[in-house]
């Protein structure tokens, strides 16, 4: 009698012990499937791919959905990184699933925020909070079912480096001082808010999907810091960075035309953490200003479409230089 039989565990005649991994409702629970958990799927991350996968969705619909999600985050004093995680989950889910119903988008994006809050917040959102902002049209079971659907689609890869992650890393390198604590933020909070407002606005545009997150973060910095210094810090060559910087210029001009707003105060949040809370400007109005101020020259029009050839070059460069980027940031 084999050792497994002596221990009272049947191998089912296959010579292998039974799996004690939880059943997630999948049709298959092969070892290959389990090995892929926590790893990102290979997919084309672009505006064209998303709109092909979701033909019923327009670029403006995506902007409205994410802008509304910012408002939800502000209502519950949710951190900006939590929003950016939710945005990443939402976009990846739309890229992976085909032809989703528009009526399900609110449930999907709220569930993405629910998952993100569990990853990032010390006090995660409750389903009842999300049900309230959705006017109670979704049951608790619907949120739980959707949570499982999204997690399975993403293969539980729910700790990606977001555009905000890259931005904060670059800022830390940029403002680092000798003998300073690397865990403390050294950059001025008011400048940080202006920088993140530009990133917020750009991420609402579906064309932001055509540029890697670190490229977006570096391009945002170029509008506040000398571009040569940004290139030195990020390691991204000018010929790959410049198209995204040009594409982003009308967003920066629109924000300047819109003007700044006083920093919002959240009574439940510590003073030193106030600037990390996701807030919402009237971004849809700013996007309209951005459209009206965008140059119509051929070069600007190509940048406005985030010329896929150029951004594909940036994506390819990223794949081969990822280790170099991290070395530069150390």
Tell where the protein language model's regions lie, with residue ranges:
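Acidic, serine/threonine-rich low-complexity regulatory regions at protein termini
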Residues: 1-110, 114-330
């Amino acid at each position: 009698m084999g050792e497994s039989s002596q221990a009272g565990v049947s191998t089912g005649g296959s010579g292998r012990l039974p799996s004690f991994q939880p059943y997630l409702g999948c049709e298959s629970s092969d070892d290959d499937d389990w090995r892929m958990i926590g790893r990102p799927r290979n997919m084309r991350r672009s505006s064209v791919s998303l709109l092909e996968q979701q033909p019923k969705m327009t670029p403006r619909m995506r902007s409205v959905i994410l802008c509304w999600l910012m408002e939800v985050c502000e209502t519950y004093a949710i951190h900006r990184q939590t929003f950016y995680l939710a945005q990443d989950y939402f976009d990846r889910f739309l890229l992976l699933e085909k032809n989703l119903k528009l009526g399900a988008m609110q449930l999907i994006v709220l569930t993405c925020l629910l998952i993100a809050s569990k990853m990032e917040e010390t006090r995660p959102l409750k389903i009842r909070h999300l049900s309230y902002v959705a006017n109670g049209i979704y049951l608790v079971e619907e949120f739980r079912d959707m949570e499982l659907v999204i997690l399975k689609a993403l293969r539980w890869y729910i700790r990606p480096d977001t555009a905000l992650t890259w931005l904060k890393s670059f800022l830390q390198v940029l403002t680092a001082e000798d003998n300073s604590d690397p865990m403390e933020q050294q950059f001025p909070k008011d400048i940080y808010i202006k920088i993140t407002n530009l990133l917020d606005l750009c991420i609402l545009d579906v064309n932001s999907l055509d540029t890697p997150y670190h490229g977006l973060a570096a391009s945002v910095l170029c509008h506040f810091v000398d571009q040569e210094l940004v290139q030195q810090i990020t390691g991204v060559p000018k010929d790959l960075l410049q198209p995204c910087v040009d594409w982003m210029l009308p967003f920066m001009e629109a924000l300047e035309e819109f003007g700044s707003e006083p920093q919002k105060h959240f009574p439940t949040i510590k003073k030193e953490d106030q600037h990390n809370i996701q807030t919402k400007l009237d971004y849809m109005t700013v996007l309209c200003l951005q459209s009206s101020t965008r140059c119509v020259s051929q070069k600007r029009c190509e940048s406005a479409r985030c010329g896929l050839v150029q951004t594909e070059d940036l994506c390819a460069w990223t794949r081969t230089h990822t280790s170099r980027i991290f070395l530069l940031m150390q």
